From Swiss-Prot:
Cell wall formation. ATP binds at residues 110-116. It catalyses: UDP-N-acetyl-alpha-D-muramate + L-alanine + ATP = UDP-N-acetyl-alpha-D-muramoyl-L-alanine + ADP + phosphate + H(+). SUPFAM superfamilies: MurCD N-terminal domain, MurD-like peptide ligases, catalytic domain, MurD-like peptide ligases, peptide-binding domain. It is found in: Cytoplasm. This is UDP-N-acetylmuramate--L-alanine ligase. It holds the Pfam family Mur_ligase_M. Pathway: Cell wall biogenesis; peptidoglycan biosynthesis. The gene is murC.
Length: 443
């Protein structure tokens, strides 16, 4: 009898992608989660993966249990039931560590840019060679016969430590997750431990001072814009259609590349993809062709229009990510008003980075803040509010409520950049409904 894989917390971005992969490999897959809608569930529903509410009755001794990393006995009935009855289970990252052993695996790690870079690498490679992949936007593709496996490698709580891939990209090291990491030294230590796991090659952003500190058994190839980088981008052109550059490996030109994406960070993402593919011996003409057709990943600078109004949805929830997203918006829409609509994610992060949030939000023309979205792991001690953050922003800044987003209407031909990792999409939907009352041209 074919084994059934049960995912507790299947709507999580990594969990849903892994479930899709196993389903495509012909496995029996089901999962449970909150009944609230989350954008990752659409792909699961389209292929017929059963989605159940949390219930101890979902757990059977013969099932292979895969548990989301956020769940414990005290917050989930299924894991409590499994523990009580002695049923074995694996955490998401533990299962993934075993899964990748059957492939030549390529991880993408970094405080920022993991999902976009994983998506770009997966798109390019899967169009050239049989490649399975797991992307942090909930997208996954699985084929047991694939030669390569591309996946997102998360540093939070050192979840990437069970991973021993052949290769990895490291986009950057930055202090995030202040509820877990003590500071930048702690984060750097985690990346050093992960670097020791890599078997054949590390591709790291050369202008990151902490990545330059790493040592490893595998060779480290640095990429960037500087003369001391192994892989270097030159002749960079950024315009309203995207970005183009020439790529060099240790002084030798390996190709000209165009990426229909915006922001300096996406040029670096593309260069890291070029570096990996070049090292693997893939044809650079093929790589260039498929970079040109990359259309992004979910919730990363995702655009739509309501009449003349542009709405951009992005997962950005750290100052570095907000800065990159607003830079991308300026590149594509240099002559229009940039309106930032940001929901701070977790009280610990908002407290830790309040000044930095205010500084980068000033890159917009106008700023609106939604109420802080607290995580299930923390308690609001009323140490900071959205209004406190608004008071730090120099540009015009207001706090808006979900039941009244009408202040957002005060901008003609605005480019609205909705950013956050909580429920900012609810504000976005409310705004779209408000706009649609005066325009039916929803694209």
């Amino acid at each position: 009898m074919e084994k059934t894989y049960h995912f507790t917390g299947i709507k999580g971005s990594g969990m849903s992608a892994l479930a899709l992969m196993l389903h495509q490999m012909g496995k029996n897959v089901q999962g449970s989660d909150s009944t609230d809608y989350f954008f990752t569930q659409r792909g699961l529903e389209q292929v017929g993966v059963p989605l159940l509410p949390f219930d101890e009755k979902n757990i059977k001794p013969e099932f292979e249990l895969i548990i989301g990393n956020a769940f414990r006995d005290d917050n989930n009935v299924e894991i409590a039931f499994a523990h009580k009855n002695g049923f074995p289970f694996k955490r998401y990252h533990e299962f993934l560590g075993h899964f990748m052993e059957d492939f030549t695996s390529i991880g993408v790690a970094g405080a920022h840019g993991k999902t976009s870079t994983t998506g770009m690498l997966a798109h390019v490679m899967s169009n050239i060679v049989d490649t399975s992949y797991l992307i942090g936007d909930g997208t996954g593709r699985g084929n047991a016969g694939s030669e390569y496996f591309v996946f997102e490698s998360d540093e939070y709580e050192r979840h990437f430590m069970p991973y021993h891939p052949e290769y990895t990209i490291m986009t950057n090291i930055d202090f995030d997750h202040p509820d877990y990491f003590e500071g930048i030294e702690d984060v750097t230590s985690a990346f050093q431990d992960y670097a020791n796991n890599i078997k054949k090659g590390i591709f790291a952003y050369g202008e990151d001072v902490n990545l330059r500190k790493l040592s490893a058994k595998a060779p480290i190839y640095y990429y960037g814009f500087e003369a001391n980088d192994d892989y270097r981008a030159e002749n960079l052109i950024r315009n309203t259609r995207g970005s183009s550059f020439d790529a060099y490996f240790r002084g030798e030109k390996i190709g000209h590349f165009v990426v229909p994406a915006y922001g300096k960070h996406n040029v670096l993402n593309a260069l890291s993809v070029v570096a990996v593919c070049h090292n693997l011996g893939l044809d650079m003409t093929d790589v260039a062709d498929h970079l040109l057709t990359f259309r992004g990943v979910k919730r990363r600078f995702t655009e739509k229009k309501v009449g003349e109004t542009v709405i951009i949805d992005d997962f950005a929830h750290h100052p570095t990510e907000i800065e990159a997203t607003l830079d991308a918006a300026r590149q594509k829409y240099p002559d229009r008003e940039i309106v930032a609509v940001f929901q701070p994610h977790t009280f610990t992060r908002t407290i830790a980075f309040a000044d930095e949030f205010a500084e980068v939000l000033d890159h917009a023309d106008t700023v609106y803040l939604a109420q802080i979205y607290g995580s299930a792991r923390e308690v609001d001690h009323h140490e900071i509010t959205a209004q406190d953050l608004a008071d730090k922003v120099r540009k015009p800044a207001k706090v808006i409520e979900l039941d009244n987003v009408s202040p957002l209407l005060d901008h003609d031909r605005g480019v609205y950049v909705f950013m956050g990792a909580g429920n900012i999409q609810k504000y976005e939907i409310a705004f779209e409904k408000l706009l649609s009352q005066t325009s039916t041209n929803l694209q």
